[in-house]
From Swiss-Prot:
Residue ranges that the UniProt entry lists as topological domain Cytoplasmic: 1-216, 281-433, 455-525, 577-622, 644-908
Ranges that cross the membrane: 217-237, 260-280, 526-546, 556-576
Annotated protein name in UniProt: Autophagy-related protein 9
UniProt topology in membrane: Multi-pass membrane protein
Organism: Neurospora crassa (strain ATCC 24698 / 74-OR23-1A / CBS 708.71 / DSM 1257 / FGSC 987)
InterPro entries in the record: Autophagy-rel_prot_9
Amino acid sequence: MADGVIARLMSGGRGARSFYEELRGRDNVSDVDDRAGLLDEENLNQHFNDYDLENAEGLRLEDSRATVDGRIPRGRAQLSGRPPRPAATTHWGTSHDDDGDNDVPASLLVERYDRGAAPLGSPGKPRSQHAGSRAHPAPGLSKGRTHQQRPHIDQELQPPLHSDAAPSSLLAGAITGNAKKMAEWRWANITNLDSFMQDVYSYYRGSGMWCIVVERVLHLIKVAFVAFLLTFLSQCVDFKKIPSNQKLSQVLVPQCTRNMSGLWNIGLWLFAFYFMWKSIQYILDLRRLTHVRDFYIHLLNIPDEDMQTITWQEVVARIMVLRDQNVRTTRTITPQNQRWVLGSQSKERLDASDIANRLMRRENYMIAMINKDILDLTIPLPILRNRQLLSQTLEWTLMFSILDFVFDPKGQVHQEFLRSDRRGILSAKLRSRFIFAGVMILILSPFVAGYLIIVYFLEYYNEIQKNPSILSARSYTPLAEWKFREFNELPHLFKRRLDMSHPFASHYIDQFPKAKTSMVAKTVSFIAGSIATVLALISVFDPEMFLGFEITHDRTVLFYTAVFGAIWSVARGSVSEDNAVFDPEYALGNVVEYTHYQPEHWKDRWHSADVKAEFEELYKLKLVIFIEEILSILTTPFVLFFSLPKSADQIIDFFREFTIHVDGLGYVCYFAEFDFKKGSKSQAPAATAGEGDVRDDYYSTKHGKMEASMYGFINNYARNPKHLPPAMRQQFHLPPVFPGITSPTLAGDLAASRMGRSQRGRSKGPLPSRTPRPGAVMAEPSPMASILLDPRHQPIFPNNMSFVNTGHQFRGGNQGDGHMMGGGSMEEDVKGAARHGQQTHDDESEDSRAGLDESAWQVSPTKDLSRENSGRGLDSVVGEEAGNGAGVVHMLYQFNQAHLNRRLGGVR
């Protein structure tokens, strides 16, 4: 909507189609993936046309009929570029309605190994269905369905084509089917996993449905109270009458609402519009909250009472268990819809890394742009030309101008940004968005500044009056938070990491000697404290004089006692403690351990004044941050008008160069995949050493951001307990006698056992083996393996990459130069390994590009469904694999299921 308004304003109101409409239209018509060869049409087993979706019943493998008068839409035939052909018969001509046999045959399902399971449906019996039932029908909407009691949930591989398949209301769902069946049906028919995972995570951060509802109601009450209080004090009270009157009724302005100014009336109308809009939005959102609550209660077995205490890692684990219980269904769908599902909406990509990538898809790009200094945030004013300022106001405008422009409503990157020939027009449109955002900030700046000042004053005045020392409290600036934030780090995990660093950061700032400041502060505190003490003693002997005696005009003893008491508190807080020990290495070392931020020039200089000054720019007084936030409302338009348009070309190039496509996940930031090997391989064939260094700098992050992000991510989801002190954590776990189900070595063996004969014949390198060969770069089992990560995301380090050499050590270890980020980085180690072992690297890269069938522990995922094997049952396929020596895989699969159920308390 906003994009359309901008386009019409820029085009002068012409009736031509806007740029954003054309952008969305090109995304729907053409896909760059088709031209880039990201999808192998040859492996789809059958070629479908676009018009086959409307006549999908004729494509059933068990039945094929011709129709007498079958037609296809004219527009669709023209788009396909082929002459129209007779379509299959439609279900309108059928004389019977067999809803009981409306399910996918068991031969087309790849599900858990269960020999006792009854077959679902009859594959040899013809089926017919109504026009509006192509998507999964809601539970209870069809009569005589006996397959609703099955324990599994079918995964929808195409978006619902008709809305009448969904339940009409919650009441209808409650009458015709229980809440669990409704939750299962909604889970099976999710069409946007990014939006769904955002809802799940927002529900978790809000601590449940009722906490979210209470928070929203209190927000409306707070906003209404502020509007009423300001209107009453500014328009309905005559302050000139207060000295001569003793009652409130005597100073009120009669009919004050009729005498208000026009500007205040506009403000009240804007408030009324906001209040009504948010109220309607909250009421309509109750349905979505109810659906998410049912998902937590019935599918994840997490009641609302546990939402305030359960960890996010436990939620992810239960989502993975739900994913593993979900069978995969193949349907006769067009290649376009199949590309849509396999491209970004596969539920097999739902481990901890994939969920974080979906939640942080937009923020990862912002983290990378801040890290690589893509954005020019300098203030174009003579006195502040070399100063960068990132306020919340500027952050909101960046989200609107850049991210809302790059991403489509489905959360994917627009295809136009991946084409180099569209660089010029996209850069021009981005500059126009910057200018439009600057104009809107200029218009809204008086209202925003006034609102922030009033709310801040009402919220913190009493706290400052009771404890003036909080004026010296510090916090990280918004720019520092974006510099510290890591790829795939969720907001609540990032906040916890920063909160743990605050005591050490304050200790680092306070311990530096402040001789001159301490001497002045001691003198000021002595004088102010003496005057306050004298006034307090006088008030003890004569309380009436304390209240009525005026030291200056209209200023009593009480007033000056409060003033000098506040001065004494502030001055006393500026004095260094007498028993303070100067040890900046210890304090800043702990800060670096939690923030994971240490520029190269900070090493061996933690005690210097330059490092302290740089750190103070990142860790400022809260009062200074608030003043900068108010002033940024005035400086943000200048940044949007003059500084950021210079970065438009670099921003467009950044999204084109650092956007990759992951099957089942969609387009993500390159750094968020933690693919060190891929980056080193692409950078290896440089012409000269100088060119190689330039490319390495361009395709890598600064300050070891990607390496620190990977270690931080593994630390959040690994089995290493985080509630213990760092010195007591186990640095290495000895491998068990029988390899655990999360062991990377076992994952490699399972991948080898699941590899088909044709894949083994095309393999470039030797098959994985537990016995290392001399001179080969073998993957070592990582001590940080996690059950919340699929095998493709488990941390595996080659022999020539040392985990200790990266310098990541805990506080209990060595605290020398390599306290946190000493030694060579992982990116450099992997680049060196790629240059010395290209063949081995190619083999590992070939293994890492596994299909979506390897994203979950399956019994027989190597047997692709086709016309040749679709007629056979699942037992025959399993029998073939058992005959080929896959019985151990079944045993390990059962061991995995038992391990998961025991770990998650029997969640199924």
